[in-house]
Amino acid sequence: GERYLSSLGLKSRLETKEALHSVSLEQGAAYLKETYDLKQTIPEIIKDVLKIVADFYKYEAVLKPGVKETLEWLEEQGIKMAVATSGNKALTEAALERNGVADHFGKIFTCTEIGLGKDEPDIYLAAAEFLGSKPQETIVWEDALHAAQTAKTAGFVVLGVYDESGKDAVPEMKEICEEYFDRMDAWLAGHK
């Protein structure tokens, strides 16, 4: 959102980053149009945002610290994994491939495919069903406050991990999540 608004000569408001963090692309475009009174149509906003996001995922996106090691260990333990993202599927696949972790996941679920954002539990429920587990037996790693709240309310075990975009929500994340970590391998250190 911030890069898109900047491309229009607009400054992103503080609350915009959190508002966009756990919603579908369509929901985010509608939010930007309404909040910033944009003349662009929702499909035009989506197209422009996808171009910006595509460049980021293809050329810039890096894994959070400790993710690769944690995924490798989980796979060695025979734990099945899936991705539940509010991002675009093709871009998520590209970023996972570029970072060498795509093979750890059995499937990628997107809010767009599910038809709802992470403010509803459907994406987590679909992933759990695919994995053959019940919510209370399924760990959800989250870095977004609203998404963590949704997963927790739906009965999932929620582990929080730091993300720069959600730094202002860390105290709330620590309250909501079963455990909260600055990096994923901090969790791994306690489970090896």
What are these model-predicted stretches?
Residues 15-16, 57-58, 79, 83, ...:
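Short, contiguous strand/loop micro-motifs
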